[in-house]
Amino acid sequence: MSKIEEKLFQDRYRVDSGRPHIRIKDPDHCTELSEKQCTVCCPAGCYTRETNGKVTLVTDGCLECGTCRIICQDSGNLEWEWPRGGFGILFKFG
């Protein structure tokens, strides 16, 4: 049985430089939250909790699963759209 990291390594990404498909509208809003659920639930690890409480987002390697969109739905603090055609994740095994 192979590890999840080995399977994810098979996937490829075409990064759309300067045009991320996910954006945190107000980073200060995330600082005010006691729990930063996106930092725990994102399977690709795109969200990182900094020591000062801020949440940083790097969309390179995003699996486009929509988990963060569901988690942050109530706050409305996340802009999420599909990447432009030809960009984003390229799944090798389905």
From Swiss-Prot:
InterPro entries associated with the record: 4Fe4S_Fe-S-bd (IPR017896), ETF-QO/FixX_C (IPR007859), Fd_FixX (IPR012206)
Organism: Azotobacter vinelandii
Domain of life: Bacteria
Family in the record: To ferredoxins from P.putida and C.tartarivorum, ferredoxin I from A.vinelandii, ferredoxin II from D.desulfuricans.
GO molecular function, one term: iron-sulfur cluster binding
Source species taxonomy: Bacteria, Pseudomonadati, Pseudomonadota, Gammaproteobacteria, Pseudomonadales
PANTHER family given in the database record: FERREDOXIN-LIKE, FERREDOXIN-LIKE PROTEIN YDIT
Primary gene name: fixX
GO BP terms, alphabetized: nitrogen fixation
Keywords of the record: Electron transport, Iron, Iron-sulfur, Metal-binding, Nitrogen fixation, Repeat, Transport
4Fe-4S ferredoxin-type domain: residues covered: 20-52, 53-83
Function comment: Could be a 3Fe-4S cluster-containing protein.
Listed name of the protein: Ferredoxin-like protein
